[in-house]
Structures are given as structure tokens and as C-alpha cells.
């Protein structure tokens, strides 16, 4: 390896940047284009802001699952709660 100028920042070292720009393509060649492409495209890791998903609302006429659970009878405890008598 050839010596690198110590005054250069690490991201400006020769060979640290690919000669071509990154693309939005997800083919194998583009996924291994550079370290950033590999992390975002091949591994699927992105640290950007996540888009908030809209909650899917149930139709007006249907009941929610939570309401149907509250109408169920409570389970009866079996046996004496204080323990067996001997």
C-alpha cells in the first residue's frame, strides 16, 4: 500500500470513495458497490427517520377484539384457595 497523507481526513483517503456514484438499484453489483450500499441495500439497515404508518381502522359495524374479551365470564378457581384441609 502506498503511504497516505496524514493531514487528509479518513473519508478523503484515496480508495475510500468509489469512482461511480451510488444508485437506487438493488442488483447484486450495486449492493456491493461500496460499504454504504452494502449496509443499506444488502443488509437493509438504515438509520434515517422512520415513516409513521397509518393504523388500519376496523370497519364501523365490526366489534373490536378487546370488547369481545371483556364480555367473557371469568374463570372459576378450582379447589379451596387457602389450601387442602387435612
Curated annotation (Swiss-Prot):
Sorted alphabetically, the Gene Ontology cellular component annotations on this record are: extracellular region; host cell cytoplasm; host cell nucleolus
- Region of interest (Disordered), residue spans: 48-86
Binding residues for Zn(2+) 1 = 22, 33-34, 37
Q: Where is this site: Essential for Tat translocation through the endosomal membrane?
A: 11
Alphabetized InterPro entries for the sequence? IV_Tat, Tat_dom_sf
Q: Does the keyword Secreted apply?
A: yes
* Start and end residues of each stretch annotated as Transactivation: 1-48
Question: Which GO terms of type biological process are on file?
Answer: DNA-templated transcription; positive regulation of transcription elongation by RNA polymerase II; positive regulation of viral transcription; symbiont-mediated perturbation of host chromatin organization; symbiont-mediated suppression of host innate immune response; symbiont-mediated suppression of host translation initiation; symbiont-mediated suppression of host type I interferon-mediated signaling pathway
N6-acetyllysine-modified residues are 28, 50-51
Q: How does it assemble?
A: Interacts with host CCNT1. Associates with the P-TEFb complex composed at least of Tat, P-TEFb (CDK9 and CCNT1), TAR RNA, RNA Pol II. Recruits the HATs CREBBP, TAF1/TFIID, EP300, PCAF and GCN5L2. Interacts with host KAT5/Tip60; this interaction targets the latter to degradation. Interacts with the host deacetylase SIRT1. Interacts with host capping enzyme RNGTT; this interaction stimulates RNGTT. Binds to host KDR, and to the host integrins ITGAV/ITGB3 and ITGA5/ITGB1. Interacts with host KPNB1/importin beta-1 without previous binding to KPNA1/importin alpha-1. Interacts with EIF2AK2.
Q: Know the name of this protein?
A: Protein Tat
User: Which organism is the protein's source?
Assistant: Human immunodeficiency virus type 1 group M subtype B (isolate BH10) (HIV-1)
